[in-house]
A protein has these predicted regions:
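Histidine/cysteine-enriched polar flanking segments
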Residues: 1-293
Length: 293
């Protein structure tokens, strides 16, 4: 019996849209962990029960938070553990870094007040192969390609960021920009867009500070106006229910209203290990309309 195709290959050949697929995250806690990453990386790690419970609590804390393990090849023998705290809220982005002597130190430090500001972007490449085969197959070559075109301090392997079938996946912090289906050959193009503080629409999944319906509207406004600067599009308002939304963005000195509706994609395997075919939820944006502010 032939092996099932990879979920990322199915998504790509089926031309599943990338737009409006970014996870909703405002606060990121990145913890360097050089041990094996199991399917549930933190749960299967060698961290103490107290540290595991602490990380679970941090991941559940408001605002919308996510805890990821990260690593870099050249830091395998480092005597300290790198920890990052990033904020991705619109208009208030930041990244801070601190070095700890051990994981138990996480229990004692106030992550809200410690750490040094990071003056460069942090690129997370999902290489979490135990979570999904596609993350390793497409993520690891992409990680190596990015390390070859930018300071290696900028690029980290990470555990699951969401959307395995869109691998290779990159999250650009502090802005929380999700990119998918990034090939190694496009590494330099992606880095150039990051350095120029603009969105690379070809691979853009969305911005983590927005819900998925708002992500769909943001992309529609960027496509209609050509406004690619990260801060060149600003959310004004959103209202709606579980099936229809009206979202207003400001861009190019104009307010734009976008109607977004919820739909379903084609039947597919959402992950490599999924046994059942499912229809992914999708968000379809109408044509942006100018409106009075």
């Amino acid at each position: 019996m032939s092996a099932r195709p990879l979920c990322a290959d199915l998504s790509r050949t089926g031309e599943e849209p990338l737009a409006a697929t970014a996870s909703r995250v405002d606060t990121w806690l990145l913890v360097e962990y050089r041990g094996l990453w199991g399917h549930e990386a933190a749960a299967t790690s060698t961290l103490s029960p107290e540290v595991k419970a602490h990380l679970r609590a941090l991941g559940a804390a408001p605002p919308r938070s996510r805890v990821l393990f990260v690593r870099r090849t050249e830091r395998r023998s480092s005597p300290t553990i790198a920890v990052f705290l990033a904020r991705s809220t619109e208009g208030a982005t930041s990244v801070r870094r601190l070095e700890l002597d051990g994981y138990d130190d996480l229990l004692a430090v106030d992550l809200e007040t410690v750490g040094e500001p990071v003056g460069h972007p942090v690129l997370l490449v999902c290489t979490h192969g135990k979570h999904d085969r596609c993350c390793a197959k497409f993520g690891r070559p992409l990680y190596e390609a990015l390390r070859n075109v930018v300071d290696e301090e900028w690029v980290w392997q990470s555990t699951h960021v969401g959307g395995d079938r869109f691998a290779g996946n990159v999250v650009s912090l502090p802005h929380g920009l999700y990119y998918g289906r990034v090939d190694p050959a496009a590494a330099l193009t992606l880095v150039e867009s990051v350095l120029e503080s603009r969105v690379l629409l070809e691979n853009y999944r969305g911005r983590s500070c927005y819900s998925m319906p708002v992500q769909a509207a943001e992309r529609a406004v960027r496509e209609a106006t050509g406004a690619l600067g990260i801060e060149g599009v600003r959310l004004i308002s959103t209202r709606g229910d579980s099936a229809r939304w009206l979202v207003v963005f400001a861009a190019a000195g104009v307010a734009w209203e976008v109607e977004v509706r919820c739909g379903e994609g084609e039947l597919t395997h959402l992950t490599c290990d999924a046994n059942e075919l499912r229809r992914p939820r999708c968000y379809v944006a109408g044509t942006p309309r100018e409106r009075a502010v």
